[in-house]
Regions:
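Conserved acidic/glycine
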Residues: 1-56, 242, 247, 252-325
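Glycine-rich ThDP/TPP pyrophosphate-binding loop and its adjacent helix/strand module
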Residues: 116-310
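Cofactor-binding active-site loop characterized by glycine-rich and histidine/acidic residues
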Residues: 32-170, 188-194, 199-206
Length: 325
């Protein structure tokens, strides 16, 4: 881990957080009540990733052009960290024709063919798709890698287990990532499984499994690096579970009554100020650097917001575009 790596990780985490914070603000404008998905400038539901940034930046730091990611209904952090264009992504979230899917997909169905990025609101759906990417890479004889991301709730789905088994049998270059934020919507882990680490399940499929803490972004970086290197070398799949924290609701408008006293502890678990403090203590960052990095991120986000707001809204005729059957 070099100083440059550390700065890059921190900057990307801040960039993602400022993006999500601005969406939070824009999404709630003109929405009364907060969960009215038909009101405001941004249609549909909204699932934001605040608190889970280290998972995305730590993994994506090892990916290169041509590697593939399949993400979840909470996809923004992985999309941005993987190089998806912020302007086109935000235009899609606003439902504009300049968006990644011409405004037809929305925030849960982002698709970027150039960067091999996709996501879905269907739980565990991305795992089989990532295996398909990995199989294609293997047959072509490239060193490309696929990354499949899901939450801990999806680890009890059949598609999760089928994908791990298939990837191990076929020795596919895929890294399975579980973001464990302790809640499958409002269901705590203890109500759905008796195990304390999904990483332990990897052994049953003959692959390495490791669990790391989200608040240690450098630990995420190291674990992801080992898994990606293994896949590129033709040594097969790995499983990484990242114990993370969801700072905001499952969706915007979620009252989070089920979290109880945990809500009072979230600020001290925020990974961005934790990492900033560590970098300041080690002399890598200063308070002025922190302010400058945030201002730079805010400027990029503002430019993307203005691009989205000034982009056309689809017409009725646009509904027939890209319909083939």
């Amino acid at each position: 881990m070099t100083t440059l790596n550390q700065l890059d990780l921190y900057k990307e985490m801040v960039r993602i957080r400022q993006f999500e914070g601005r969406i939070l603000q824009e999404y709630h404008a003109d929405k009364t009540p907060a969960w009215d998905i038909g009101a405001g400038l941004i249609p549909g539901e909204m699932h934001l990733s605040a608190g889970q940034e280290p998972a995305a930046v730590g993994v994506c730091a090892h990916l290169k052009k041509g590697d593939a990611i399949t993400a979840t209904h909470r996809p923004h952090h992985f999309a941005l960290a993987h190089g998806v264009d912020m302007k086109a992504m935000l235009a899609e979230i606003y439902g504009r024709t300049t968006g990644l899917c011409q405004g037809k997909g929305g925030h849960m169905h982002l698709f970027d063919a150039e960067n091999h990025f996709s996501c879905s609101g269907i739980i565990a759906q991305g795992y089989p798709v990532a295996c398909g990417h990995a199989l294609a890479f293997k047959r072509r004889g490239t060193d490309q890698v696929a990354v499949a991301v899901t939450g801990e709730g999806a680890a009890n789905q059949g598609a999760f287990h089928e994908s791990l088994n298939l990837a191990a049998v076929w020795n596919l270059p895929v890294v399975f990532v579980i973001e464990d934020n302790d809640w499958a919507i409002s269901v705590p882990r203890s109500h759905s499984t008796s195990n304390t680490s999904n990483a332990d399940r990897a052994a049953g499929y003959g692959m390495p499994g490791v669990r790391v803490e989200n608040n240690d972004v450098e630990a995420v970086f190291e674990a992801a690096g080992a898994a990606v290197d293994r896949a590129r070398a033709g040594e097969g799949p790995s499983l990484i579970e990242i114990h993370t924290v969801r700072l905001w609701g499952h969706f915007e408008g979620d009252a989070q009554a089920y979290r109880g006293a945990e809500l009072d502890t979230l600020d001290v678990r925020d990974p961005i100020p934790i990492y900033a403090a560590a970098l300041i203590d080690s002399g890598i960052l200063s308070d002025d650097d922190v302010a400058s990095i945030q201002a730079e991120a805010d400027a990029e986000v503002e430019e993307a917001v203005q691009f989205a707001l000034n982009s056309p809204v689809p017409t009725a005729d646009d509904a027939l575009l890209h319909v083939f059957a």
